[in-house]
């Protein structure tokens, strides 16, 4: 009897221990799965901003990294930004935003007394702008080289002297215009345009060399940062070099052009004179032909006069004498060269 009772106790004890072993394994598995959630819950609890455990587990089910959201909430709470809740962080993450960047930007802006709320920060982040870098630029202004590739801004004063200069523009981010505002390239282009215009408005290049700060002042007064994502704090001219004498070069080119025009006009007049001369020669040849024709008609007219009795022998002799005198005078009037040719 005692033997049977001992066997029953051993069998029941084995089942009990097996049940305890299985239960321990299940508990270990459950603890390994939810242990990280419990750790995050405890971390939030001791930080003074408790988050329900089931809410943390739900983040994982919604494909939201719980550690990122919990750490962001703790950082905001410790920084004094207690009006931003876990739901806001989850919504921004699901919208494709960068929660850590937004949180760091909000904390930095709050410490630097820069007006930036959660709604605007998330809008800037979702627009594709780096809100963290923008706030850092607002706190620590950055310097932009103009031009930004090591070249020069070239302008020409009214006296024709070319000036090559470089400038440095100190800017900080304009949070209000960060979404939709023009970028750094626009600032560089506008500053370059303003410097060229200011140099071009100077009477002489010496005025620019003597007072480069006047150029900076004129450029700043134009409000070049309107509709951009930056506020221009200062424009400093760091280098000015003399270039070519563009005015003299232009005058030289103009003089050469005038010479070519004058030569063309002279050639045109010469050609017209030659053409007129040839035309006059043609007229002379025509008149000579008419003269020869008229002279050929004289003997016929004289013969007709003899037949009709209108011309006598004495009249004919007188005409011959006059013709001889005329030939003699013509011979005396000819140059020596014409006489030799004859």
Curated annotation (Swiss-Prot):
The keyword Transmembrane applies. Pfam families: FloA. Its main location: membrane. The chain crosses the membrane at residues 18-38, 39-59. It comes from the Bacteria. Keywords: Cell membrane, Membrane, Transmembrane, Transmembrane helix. The keyword Transmembrane applies. Found in functional membrane microdomains (FMM) that may be equivalent to eukaryotic membrane rafts. FMMs are highly dynamic and increase in number as cells age. Flotillins are thought to be important factors in membrane fluidity. Homooligomerizes. HAMAP family: FloA (MF_01562). Belongs to the flotillin-like FloA family. This is Flotillin-like protein FloA. The gene is floA.
